[in-house]
Amino acid sequence: MRKLSFLDRVIEELDSYARFTKVPLNPSKKSPSSDTIDGKLSEIEKKHSAGLMRVDYTGEICAQGLYRGQASVAKSPQTKEHLYHAAAEEYDHLAWCGERLQELGARPSLLNPFWYWTSFGIGAVAGSISDSLSYGFVVETEKQVMKHLDSHLKSLPVNDNRSREILKQMYIDESEHAVEAEKAGGKKLPKTVKAIMKLQSKVMTTLAYRF
């Protein structure tokens, strides 16, 4: 098997990004909301739910970018495989959120290309330093995503049963991903790096909710 050139990798990532942003996506697992019936939502409630799900969709776009960026420069084959596997599992979350956005009559954030490639760059930089730092970013990312999911579960309209089932399953999965990354040797990130990640996350959630 020939080694991929830099150009080959660029083309591969562009193709992957094109697949991630194509709606609807084809998840490997059916949505947790498949057998759930919604209560009646007012237009205001529907708009709020759409904003929250748009944020969660963008969060999954960021996860795809981060993991694929890390995997593209991973030091060991095991780390590379672990990260691509994590990205594949996050793909289901992306598909579920995209499907729910369609049900709510909403679209993904217009800024997703920016967030994907920014996350890809951060992942590539972290991954080029060391695998342990790369796993550290996974741990911190998953913990921040879990905080968002928890706040969204509390903020969802009472009757938005379908969105709630999706976010509950995502929370469980993200928790498992964080534990797996810690077991793989995730290095604890400096407080400054965590603060920057939180700031970036705050900007992303604010913009994605509206745009």
UniProtKB/Swiss-Prot annotation:
<feature type="binding site">
    <location>
        <position position="60"/>
    </location>
    <ligand>
        <name>Fe cation 1</name>
    </ligand>
</feature>
<dbReference type="InterPro" id="IPR047809">
    <property type="entry name" value="COQ7_proteobact"/>
</dbReference>
<keyword id="KW-0408">Iron</keyword>
<keyword id="KW-0560">Oxidoreductase</keyword>
<feature type="binding site">
    <location>
        <position position="142"/>
    </location>
    <ligand>
        <name>Fe cation 2</name>
    </ligand>
</feature>
<keyword id="KW-0472">Membrane</keyword>
<dbReference type="InterPro" id="IPR012347">
    <property type="entry name" value="Ferritin-like"/>
</dbReference>
<comment type="function">
    <text>Catalyzes the hydroxylation of 2-nonaprenyl-3-methyl-6-methoxy-1,4-benzoquinol during ubiquinone biosynthesis.</text>
</comment>
<feature type="binding site">
    <location>
        <position position="90"/>
    </location>
    <ligand>
        <name>Fe cation 2</name>
    </ligand>
</feature>
<keyword id="KW-0479">Metal-binding</keyword>
<comment type="similarity">
    <text>Belongs to the COQ7 family.</text>
</comment>
<dbReference type="GO" id="GO:0006744">
    <property type="term" value="P:ubiquinone biosynthetic process"/>
</dbReference>
<keyword id="KW-1003">Cell membrane</keyword>
<dbReference type="GO" id="GO:0008682">
    <property type="term" value="F:3-demethoxyubiquinol 3-hydroxylase activity"/>
</dbReference>
<dbReference type="InterPro" id="IPR009078">
    <property type="entry name" value="Ferritin-like_SF"/>
</dbReference>
<feature type="binding site">
    <location>
        <position position="174"/>
    </location>
    <ligand>
        <name>Fe cation 2</name>
    </ligand>
</feature>
<dbReference type="GO" id="GO:0046872">
    <property type="term" value="F:metal ion binding"/>
</dbReference>
<comment type="pathway">
    <text>Cofactor biosynthesis; ubiquinone biosynthesis.</text>
</comment>
<feature type="binding site">
    <location>
        <position position="90"/>
    </location>
    <ligand>
        <name>Fe cation 1</name>
    </ligand>
</feature>
<feature type="binding site">
    <location>
        <position position="93"/>
    </location>
    <ligand>
        <name>Fe cation 1</name>
    </ligand>
</feature>
<protein>
    <recommendedName>
        <fullName>3-demethoxyubiquinol 3-hydroxylase</fullName>
        <ecNumber>1.14.99.60</ecNumber>
    </recommendedName>
</protein>
<keyword id="KW-0831">Ubiquinone biosynthesis</keyword>
<feature type="binding site">
    <location>
        <position position="177"/>
    </location>
    <ligand>
        <name>Fe cation 2</name>
    </ligand>
</feature>
<dbReference type="Pfam" id="PF03232">
    <property type="entry name" value="COQ7"/>
</dbReference>
<dbReference type="GO" id="GO:0005886">
    <property type="term" value="C:plasma membrane"/>
</dbReference>
<dbReference type="InterPro" id="IPR011566">
    <property type="entry name" value="Ubq_synth_Coq7"/>
</dbReference>
<feature type="binding site">
    <location>
        <position position="174"/>
    </location>
    <ligand>
        <name>Fe cation 1</name>
    </ligand>
</feature>
<keyword id="KW-0503">Monooxygenase</keyword>
